């Protein structure tokens, strides 16, 4: 088989899957559009939001410690990878969270994402937790080095996909 030299066209073709929306029928009369493939950039954005949401909530007087972090992580995933239009401001985001988590749709939406994408999400959250654990025990200089290395790693992953 002939090999192609890597170029921008091939890279664009490779990452185009991240822009594809898929209609998912949740019940007989309710559907949602999801982005079934989690791009590294959007996954990083979602995880960054997951961390900053806690500070924003605290600043807005919301008792964020009462929120289950696993459910908030899954809610953040839904916010980033569906077309539900969940707002970005923390007060409305928490309002959406409370309603959505209690609805029949929450588990249906989560289960509609492909297993491979959910595995990618699980690995990313595990890596984030490991990094947060490390950060609590190291100096600011070492933190900067870790961040720079992680950015480089993510950029290399994007180029490889």
Residue ranges and their predicted role:
Residues 40-161:
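Short, surface-exposed, charged amphipathic helix/loop patches that serve as local interaction elements
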Residues 2-53:
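N-terminal "first-domain core" detector
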């Amino acid at each position: 088989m002939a090999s192609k030299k890597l170029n921008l066209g091939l890279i664009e073709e490779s990452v185009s899957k991240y822009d594809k929306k898929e209609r998912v029928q949740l019940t007989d009369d309710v559907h949602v559009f999801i982005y079934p493939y989690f791009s590294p950039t959007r996954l990083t954005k979602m995880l960054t939001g997951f961390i900053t949401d806690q500070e924003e909530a605290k600043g807005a007087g919301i008792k964020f410690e009462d929120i289950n972090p696993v459910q908030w992580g899954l809610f953040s995933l839904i916010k980033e990878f569906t077309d539900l239009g969940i707002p970005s401001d923390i007060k409305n985001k928490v309002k959406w969270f409370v309603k959505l988590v209690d609805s029949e749709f929450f588990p249906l939406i989560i289960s509609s994402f492909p297993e491979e994408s959910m595995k990618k999400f699980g690995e990313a959250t595990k890596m984030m937790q490991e990094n947060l654990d490390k950060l609590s025990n190291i100096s600011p200089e070492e933190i900067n080095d870790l961040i720079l290395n992680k950015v480089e790693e993510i950029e290399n992953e994007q180029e490889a996909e």
